[in-house]
Amino acid sequence: MKIGFIGLGIMGRPMAKNLLKAGYDVTVDSHSPAAAAELEACGAKVADQPTIGSTCDLVLTMLPNAPQVKQVMLGANGVAAHMQLGSTFIDMTSLNPIASKEIAAELAARGIQMLDAPVSGGEPKAIDGTLSFMVGGEEE
């Protein structure tokens, strides 16, 4: 499975590192070149968002807010426009339910499944890989 990870901040960077440590094929994108370079040094590929959409089976985001998630996924040349039918998007941003449902509906219309999966535990739990996830989405 190829995983795309967008958002390498305080939480995203250690989460992506843990995926690499577990042996996953991870491609990253970040507005911070230093964060992307750090992950590349750990074995990640670095690519732009359209490439992540077209080459990854699963796309994960850990972004600050709903407008950024919408821009990354649904904006002009956003990730969703390049994702394959049947692929999955997991958003770990703490979105409000209305924004999450709007994004999920738009993605479902494109044949992409979305799971809303905010996390609890903060940076220490992200570093040691023991975050708690609260996951919501379609049952299938």
What are these regions (language model features)?
Residues 1-61, 87, 123-126:
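NAD(P)+-binding Rossmann beta1-loop-alpha1 motif at the extreme N-terminus of oxidoreductases
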Residues 3, 95-140:
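Rossmann-fold dinucleotide-binding core
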Residues 7-15, 78-81, 89, 124-125, ...:
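Short, flexible micro-motifs
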Residues 8, 19-20, 39, 63, ...:
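Generic leucine side-chain signal with a strong bias for well-ordered alpha-helical environments
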Residues 9, 33, 63-66, 97, ...:
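Alpha-helix N-cap/helix-start capping motif
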Residues 18-21, 41-43, 73-76, 103-107, ...:
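Short, glycine/charged-enriched secondary-structure capping and boundary segments
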Residues 29, 62, 93, 135-136:
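Active-site-adjacent beta-strand anchor residues
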Residues 50-117:
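Rossmann-fold NAD(P) dinucleotide-binding segment
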